[in-house]
Amino acid sequence: MGKRIGLFGGTFDPVHIGHMRSAVEMAEQFALDELRLLPNARPPHRDAPQVSAAQRLAMVERAVAGVERLTVDARELLRDKPSYTIDTLESVRAELAADDQLFMLIGWDAFCGLPTWHRWEALLEHCHIIVLQRPDADSEPPEALRDLLAARSVADPRALKGPGGQITFVWQTPLAVSATQIRALLGNGRSVRFLVPDAVLNYIEAHHLYRAPH
C-alpha cells in the first residue's frame, strides 16, 4: 500500500485554529499518513499579504510542531517565479511513489474558481481533489465545472481509488474564525488568544505583527 499524502494550501496570514481544526479533521477522516500545510507564495491572483513570507512560514511551523501527521511544505515560498498550484502538484508528485495517493484540500469558493487557475484541467492528473463544503455555501458549481464533475465526482470519500483523478465533497462546519478578523483585532490592539495556537500568538507578539502603525 502506498502512502496517503494531503496538501492544504493557504496564505495562513496568520494560521489560526480554524485552519488547524480542519487539518486535524481531514487527516483523521482520510486516514492520511501526512497532511502538509502549504503556505502560498503571493498567488498571481491574490493581493500580497502584509506580513513577509518568512514570517507566515514561521507561524505555520510553530502551529504544526508536535501535532501528529501535520507537517509544513515550504516549496511555494522558495520559488523565484509566480507560484501556480499545478507546478506544486507536479513537483510533489515527482517525489512520491507511483502508488502513493495525493489529495488536495480546497474550499468550496476556491473550487468554484478553479476554471480561472493556470492549467486547471491538468490538476487531476496528479491528485484527488477534496472540496470542503460549508453548510452556508452556494450549492451550484459554475457551468465550466459541470462536465468535470459528471465525469470525476465520487459521492463516497472513502471510494477514492488510485493515485489521483477524482473529486469528492466533504461537509465541514468550520470554526467561526477568520484571518481577516484576527488581523483586525490585532490592528486595534485587541487579544487574539484562543483564536490562534499559543506558539503562533507568542510569535506574533514577539515580532509585533499586524499592529497598526503608530
Swiss-Prot record:
A Pfam family of this chain: CTP_transf_like
Q: Which reaction does it catalyse?
A: nicotinate beta-D-ribonucleotide + ATP + H(+) = deamido-NAD(+) + diphosphate
From the UniProt record, which GO molecular function terms apply?
ATP binding; nicotinate-nucleotide adenylyltransferase activity
Q: In which pathway does it act?
A: Cofactor biosynthesis; NAD(+) biosynthesis; deamido-NAD(+) from nicotinate D-ribonucleotide: step 1/1
Answer whether the UniProt record assigns the keyword Lyase to this protein: no
Q: Which UniProt keywords apply?
A: ATP-binding, NAD, Nucleotide-binding, Nucleotidyltransferase, Pyridine nucleotide biosynthesis, Transferase
**Claim: Transferase is one of the keywords in the record:** yes
Q: Which GO terms describe its biological process?
A: NAD biosynthetic process
Enzyme Commission code: 2.7.7.18
The family database entries (InterPro entries) matched by this protein are listed as: Cyt_trans-like, NadD/NMNAT, Rossmann-like_a/b/a_fold
| Family classification | Belongs to the NadD family.
Q: Describe its function.
A: Catalyzes the reversible adenylation of nicotinate mononucleotide (NaMN) to nicotinic acid adenine dinucleotide (NaAD).
PANTHER family found in the cross-reference section: NICOTINATE-NUCLEOTIDE ADENYLYLTRANSFERASE-RELATED, PHOSPHOPANTETHEINE ADENYLYLTRANSFERASE
Q: What is this protein called?
A: Probable nicotinate-nucleotide adenylyltransferase
Organism expressing this protein natively: Pseudomonas paraeruginosa (strain DSM 24068 / PA7)
Q: What is the lineage of its organism?
A: Bacteria, Pseudomonadati, Pseudomonadota, Gammaproteobacteria, Pseudomonadales
Underlying gene? nadD
